[in-house]
């Protein structure tokens, strides 16, 4: 997900997105552990998306 798309979202929406991404990351890690994950680059993509969302949440918290 692009940062420009995330900037348009509210804090509540970003928190929801963060929760979904953390669940997806957990699921991917479990698939990796059980050798069911074929595309391991997904883990890195989700990790970077989590970082983007957390960065924007931090920016919005600083603006208040």
From Swiss-Prot:
Pfam families, A to Z: Ribosomal_L29
Molecular function per GO: structural constituent of ribosome
PROSITE patterns for the chain: RIBOSOMAL_L29 (PS00579)
GO terms (BP aspect): translation
Membrane-spanning segments: none
Coiled-coil positions: none
InterPro entries the UniProt entry points to: Ribosomal_protein_uL29, Ribosomal_uL29, Ribosomal_uL29_CS, Ribosomal_uL29_sf
Keywords linked to the UniProt accession: Ribonucleoprotein, Ribosomal protein
CDD domains linked: Ribosomal_L29_HIP
GO cellular-component term (any): cytosolic large ribosomal subunit
Family membership noted in the UniProt record: Belongs to the universal ribosomal protein uL29 family.
Protein name, as recorded: Large ribosomal subunit protein uL29
Native source organism of the sequence: Azoarcus sp. (strain BH72)
């Amino acid at each position: 997900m692009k940062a420009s798309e995330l900037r348009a979202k509210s804090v509540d929406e970003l928190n929801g997105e963060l929760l979904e991404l953390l669940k997806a990351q957990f699921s991917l890690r479990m698939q990796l552990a059980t050798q069911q994950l074929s595309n391991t680059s997904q883990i890195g993509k989700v990790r970077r998306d989590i970082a983007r969302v957390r960065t924007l949440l931090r920016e919005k918290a600083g603006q208040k």
